[in-house]
């Protein structure tokens, strides 16, 4: 499919405009209310070190990297991120929030969320401090092995949606599953997101799965190809409407470049550190305040 001849960020801006103009008004789990549409697709090239970190509002790059590495290590304690200044899971890990969804665990214990499912699918979850080494299905390792051994496979799929564990999660997965594809020496990734918060979540998710693709391409000796983003319920929270109306008026700027420059041996995805990635040329418009609905 050919790329939009305009700046690729217009895909995001146009979808936001479409939701603002045509979205169905709905109440939601958080009580905030949304404007919502069902079914959308965006495509972002990752070639030539391009990194689709949106420019019409500053995206929390450090948070993108640290959260992805947190998932790849199979970690589930939000305090690990908070110690690094990344507080995106703080509200969902709060004791009061956990109790409100019927979970009785220590503060910060998010349960069997993304990283646990990626690295230990099917294992019995105990606590965020428990060891799960050798337990469950390591979907990430299996995907990397498949890319190397059988790159033409159509089964290189990783799922975070485990119905038996949903009730134990602080928040069920919004980005549910992803699939890798190898074509002409290039690695691409398609991700399906059942629920997409267009203001805060989706810009973060675009960057996160693009980074995942770049990291796995590095490990498997491939070039990054494309990130394809499928959205189910794409929505704008009602308290984000004014902020997003402001954002869609801004012209996109050139996407930055991202280089993988490991500072030590990195043979497995969980070995990577924040310092192994170099972001060059990120020049976004100023931040726009938006509140998170938990």
UniProtKB/Swiss-Prot annotation:
The keyword Iron does not apply. One of its GO terms (molecular function) is thymidylate synthase activity. Pathway: Pyrimidine metabolism; dTTP biosynthesis. Belongs to the thymidylate synthase family. DUMP binds at residues 29, 154-155, 194-197, 205, 235-237. The keyword Ribonucleoprotein does not apply. Transmembrane segments: none annotated. The lineage of its organism: Eukaryota, Fungi, Fungi incertae sedis, Microsporidia, Unikaryonidae. One of its GO terms (biological process) is dTTP biosynthetic process. SUPFAM superfamilies: Thymidylate synthase/dCMP hydroxymethylase. Keywords: Methyltransferase, Nucleotide biosynthesis, Transferase. One of its GO terms (cellular component) is cytosol. Its EC number is 2.1.1.45. It comes from Encephalitozoon cuniculi (strain GB-M1) (Microsporidian parasite). (6R)-5,10-methylene-5,6,7,8-tetrahydrofolate binds at residue 197. This is Thymidylate synthase 3. It catalyses: dUMP + (6R)-5,10-methylene-5,6,7,8-tetrahydrofolate = 7,8-dihydrofolate + dTMP. It comes from the Eukaryota. Disulfide bonds: none annotated. The active site is at residue 174.
């Amino acid at each position: 499919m050919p790329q939009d001849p305009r700046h690729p960020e217009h895909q995001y801006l146009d979808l936001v405009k479409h939701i603002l103009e045509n979205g169905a008004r709905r109440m939601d789990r958080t009580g905030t209310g949304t404007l919502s549409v069902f079914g959308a697709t965006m495509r972002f090239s990752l070639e030539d070190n391009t990194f689709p970190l949106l420019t019409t509002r500053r995206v929390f790059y450090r948070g993108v990297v640290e959260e992805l590495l947190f998932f790849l290590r199979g970690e589930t304690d939000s305090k690990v991120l908070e110690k690094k200044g990344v507080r995106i899971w703080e509200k969902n890990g709060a004791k009061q929030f956990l109790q409100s969804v019927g979970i009785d665990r220590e503060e910060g214990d998010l349960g069997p969320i993304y990283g646990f499912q990626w690295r230990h699918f099917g294992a019995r979850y105990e606590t965020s401090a428990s060891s799960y080494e050798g337990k469950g299905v390591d979907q990430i390792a299996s995907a990397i092995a498949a890319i190397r051994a059988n790159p033409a496979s159509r089964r290189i799929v990783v799922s975070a949606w485990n119905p038996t564990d949903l009730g134990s999660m602080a928040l069920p997965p919004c980005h549910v599953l992803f699939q890798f594809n190898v074509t002409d020496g290039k690695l691409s990734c398609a991700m399906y997101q059942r629920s997409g918060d267009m203001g805060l979540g989706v810009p973060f998710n675009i960057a996160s799965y693009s980074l995942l693709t770049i990291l796995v391409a590095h490990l498997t000796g491939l070039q990054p190809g494309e990130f394809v983003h499928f959205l189910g319920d794409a929505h704008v929270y009602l308290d984000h409407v004014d902020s997003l109306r402001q954002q869609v008026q801004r012209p996109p700027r050139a996407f930055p470049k991202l280089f993988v420059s490991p500072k030590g041996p990195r043979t497995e995805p969980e070995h990577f550190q924040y310092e192994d990635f170099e972001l060059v040329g990120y020049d976004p418009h100023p931040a726009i305040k938006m509140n998170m609905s938990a």
